[in-house]
């Protein structure tokens, strides 16, 4: 059985479906509901059923994180496996950018840690970190992986260089600058700081979100309007993603335009 947060990325949900396992979802970050599902499943199967809990280090559309301490405790209590997708936390959180699990010293408790090279590493491709026994099983049994084309040498080289930057002094400096940029924008907008570099500006109406996104684009700022079906109806938003290369001037211009639209509450 796979038990997955309802707001996990579509690729995770589709992968769970392809596995042929029973799929259950729980409301976003509702760990009480997660425990109810775990408890009911274990009682029905006398704890013989293999269970995989799936969540993310930072969620891509809300920019928030789960209570990883509690999830790890639930994993242990119900003898479950744990997969954490660190796509949006890898490179920016934790020791030398290892992600949210590393930030909380929980990496050893996850059975599978996923990360992408297409974001902080500035390349393409992805990785799943796991034990040798699971690695061997995936390589020999995961149909979608077996029949995927291997990365091009140039792509692998670019990812390798990105990883070097993330782990070295330049990576530390970039994380410090990113942290400063996030604090600056949140201060100017009077918003709570997100868990990572993703800051959703909630708009609500889809037409209004498109209008604001277009206004930003006209000023040289690309900030896409996220709307249904990517998010629920009535929860359209402007998805801001900061980087270490943004200047204070860039951030001030962005904040001024957003404040002029009177959408920040």
Identify the residue ranges that each predicted region occupies.
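Active-site-proximal loop->helix
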Residues: 10-20
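Pyridoxal 5′-phosphate
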Residues: 27-31, 44-57, 87, 92-97, ...
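Conserved PLP-anchoring active-site segment centered on the Schiff-base-forming lysine
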Residues: 1-10
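Active-site phosphate-binding strand-loop segment of PLP-dependent enzymes
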Residues: 22-84
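Conserved active-site segment immediately N-terminal to the catalytic lysine
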Residues: 78-79, 86, 98-117, 136-140
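PLP-dependent aminotransferase class I/II
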Residues: 114, 120-184, 190-193
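Conserved PLP-binding catalytic core of the aspartate aminotransferase-like
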Residues: 174-186, 190-220, 230, 234-235, ...
